[in-house]
Regions:
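Conserved SAM/AdoMet-binding glycine-rich loop
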Residues: 57-58, 62, 314-421, 426-465, ...
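Radical SAM enzyme core and accessory elements
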Residues: 1-44, 51, 55-57, 503-638
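Canonical Radical SAM [4Fe-4S] cluster-binding loop centered on the CxxxCxxC motif
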Residues: 69, 270-306, 617-634
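A glycine-rich phosphate-binding loop feature that marks nucleotide/adenosyl-phosphate handling sites
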Residues: 211-222, 329-334, 358-364, 427, ...
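N-terminal pre-triad scaffold of radical SAM enzymes
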Residues: 55-61, 76-79, 265-292, 316, ...
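N-terminal [4Fe-4S]-dependent radical SAM core
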Residues: 25-56, 63-64, 221, 227, ...
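Glycine-rich beta-alpha loop elements in corrinoid/cobalamin-binding modules
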Residues: 93-238, 475-527, 535-548
């Protein structure tokens, strides 16, 4: 059967229908708390209604969060730069809009043309965070689209997804037709080339999926079937002979040649990151053992400063933004950072454009750059020691010490900063109460550093926020085998830290909601059995699970019980080092032997050096193929 749909009637009938639909939807939009979430029509929005293929790029969270995501902005322009494709945007409707759509029997629609999502050829989701999975179900149900791939017919839109959660997408694998593993710039174009060819040849859905499975980085979940034993994952059996045994992560080797992005869409409302984001480089060489992004985006690939400045020039002119964020996993490691900062500030001094460095490591913190940055305006200052003692920082391979932190905050305070955020984790492997109390002691020393300055330099006083999230074991990290501590233990350690921080001048404490961290750990290491739990929780009202005020614990507890599973069996157990992993068919390119070696080194508190100092063999026998640091020597310790 031909995978083909006709979405448009001809002539004036369609024009009249469009006007009627628009008026009806606008009346609903006007009744929401934030109508600009759904209006569309923003500056630099793309319009290509005559393109052959219609692609709905869906972000399963609110508009203000989705519009802040650089990856989605890149893919929006990659697809719209194709002559044959019109990419439109859609976001998870907040609870007020969901209720209005249901009450009025309206379907979820795109921002650009207000087209119902079920009229698109392809619906693509960004998978950034496990706690957004129920929002995917909301968006599908509001579009009249069955949840499970096996229940969707030939004429249904193809449901695809990409993003870091694809590292272990098994809990939602039965929902997706196609998953994109790795960098998306080239992968999306390759996908659309093959998709267009299949459509033109009139292939049915199965044959199209076979063709798509031949693209490096494409995973077709329906071509594989899991088996279980002893109440845990055992293996994944291949059902389609043409499918690859393992799905290889796609890498863009030269970011200067990759499509960066077109003109940024400028929202009518404030969004989380309301500024120009320049991705300095992709990947990280530091090797923090809890950090999934630090491993799955390797190798490090830098953009040339000229590429970045050309993009900044264009965006300053076409958006009116007055802040540029130098964005990467560790921006201070960019080889031209000390030239980049003053160049940008001087280049745009007449426009009063400021620079922010949101991902500075403590040991790459430079006082001269601070003074230059604050010459326009002071942006936020965030540092992440992660652990309260040097012993635990060595376990997680953080590679910084207390002196680094105190030097960094001291330089910042003397340069005019009065506010700083310090990020820590609770529940890291081998953590003890001594490590928890060490966080408070570190905060106390930061406070002393500030109040040791002369009174005239202190302004309105110190604003130091200590934030403590809960450790979540993630796939393709050395800690993927480690359990998360129990919810009761998380709460005890949070209370211990809160008590220890009391009375420290200028310091306040924020901590992450423990229930969502538990669920995140469950889905981060889960298997396909969890899709029934996900659907069960959704039907009981679970939505926007990352929002504390929306989280419905009872819905999840009942859904787990109904399916004979528990959150604890995924989140709170130690996985055997040689036990089958639900994500082992995904080839992140990082050697499993390397991850095991790093896991063992963590137990001994041995620090592994930064890859920029020499190759540590993370790509195994393929280091020469993927990484330009292999010639620097063999693995060493610091």
């Amino acid at each position: 059967m031909e995978h083909q749909k006709t979405h448009y009637h001809s002539g004036g009938i369609r024009v009249l229908e469009d006007l009627m639909d628009s008026d009806r939807l606008n009346s609903l939009i006007a009744r929401t708390e934030k109508p600009t979430r759904f209006m569309g029509g923003e500056l630099n929005m793309r319009m290509k209604p005559d393109a052959e293929f219609k692609f709905a790029l869906c972000f399963p969270d609110t508009y203000e969060i989705g519009m802040s995501h650089l990856g989605s902005r890149i893919i929006y322009n990659v697809l719209n730069n194709r002559e044959d494709t019109f990419c439109e945007r859609a976001y998870a409707p907040w609870v007020d809009m969901e209720a209005l759509l249901r009450e009025n029997s309206e379907k979820l629609f795109s921002l650009e043309t207000k087209r119902p999502l079920d009229e698109f050829d392809i619906i693509g989701f960004s998978l950034l965070y496990e706690m957004c999975y129920t929002n995917i179900l909301t968006m599908l149900e509001l579009s009249g689209i069955p949840f499970l791939s096996k229940d969707r017919g030939e004429d249904a839109p193809l449901i695809v997804a990409g993003g870091p959660c694809v590292c272990n997408s098994e809990p939602i694998a039965d929902i997706m037709d196609v998953l994109f593993f790795g960098d998306g710039e080239e992968l999306n174009n390759d996908f659309m080339d093959v998709y267009a060819s299949c459509r033109h040849r009139g292939l049915n859905k199965h044959d199209m999926l076979v063709e798509l499975s031949k693209i490096e980085g494409i995973y077709i979940p329906s071509f594989y079937e899991p088996t279980y034993g002893n109440d845990s994952f055992a293996s994944l059996r291949k059902l389609e002979p043409a499918a690859p045994d393992r799905i290889k992560r796609r890498i863009v080797h030269d970011l200067d040649l990759a499509e960066f992005t077109g003109d940024l869409v400028v929202p009518y409302m404030s969004i989380v990151h309301d500024r120009i984001a320049l991705e300095l480089f992709r990947g990280c060489t530091r090797g923090c053992r809890f950090c999934q992004a630090g491993f799955i985006y390797r190798p490090v690939r830098e953009r040339r400063m000229k590429t970045l400045l050309d993009f900044a020039d264009k965006q300053i002119k076409c958006t009116g933004y007055d802040e540029i964020s130098l964005f990467s996993l560790s921006s201070g490691d960019y080889s031209e950072i000390h030239e980049m900062v003053p160049t940008i500030l001087d280049r745009y001094k007449d426009d009063r454009v400021s620079v922010s460095l949101p991902s500075l490591r403590i040991d790459s913190f430079i006082k001269d750059d601070l003074k230059k940055i604050q010459s326009v305006r002071k942006t936020g200052l965030t540092l992440a020691p992660e652990a309260g003692t040097q012993r635990l920082r060595d376990v997680i391979n953080k590679g910084v010490n207390e002196d680094d932190l105190l030097r960094a905050v001291g330089d910042a305070f003397r340069s005019g900063w009065h506010g700083v955020k310090l990020y820590f984790m609770i529940g890291l492997p081998t953590e003890t109460d001594e490590d928890i109390l060490g966080i408070a002691e570190l905060a106390r020393k930061v406070s002393r550093e500030f109040y040791s300055m002369p009174k005239e330099m202190r302004g309105k006083g110190l604003r130091c926020t200590v934030s403590a999230s809960t450790f979540v074991p993630k796939s393709f990290t050395p800690f993927q085998w480690e359990p998360q501590i129990s919810t009761d233990e998380v709460l005890r350690r949070q209370a211990l830290l809160r008590s220890a921080l009391k009375g420290i001048r200028g310091v306040e404490f924020n901590c992450h909601f423990s229930e969502t961290s538990r669920l995140e750990a469950c889905f981060a290491r889960g298997d396909r059995r969890l899709v029934s739990v996900l659907i069960g929780a959704y039907k009981r009202g679970a939505r926007f699970d990352s929002w504390d005020e929306q989280f419905k614990k009872e819905a999840w507890d009942e859904a787990f019980m109904e399916n004979g599973l528990s959150c604890e069996q995924y989140a709170n157990r130690t996985i055997g080092i040689d036990e089958p992993l639900a994500w082992q068919h995904m080839d992140s390119l990082i050697s499993m032997e390397y991850l095991k070696r790093e896991y063992e080194r963590s137990k001994q508190g041995i620090v592994t050096r930064d890859c920029r100092s020499g190759c540590n063999g993370c790509f195994g026998e393929h280091c020469k193929e993927y990484c330009n640091m292999h010639s620097s020597g063999s693995e060493e310790t610091e």
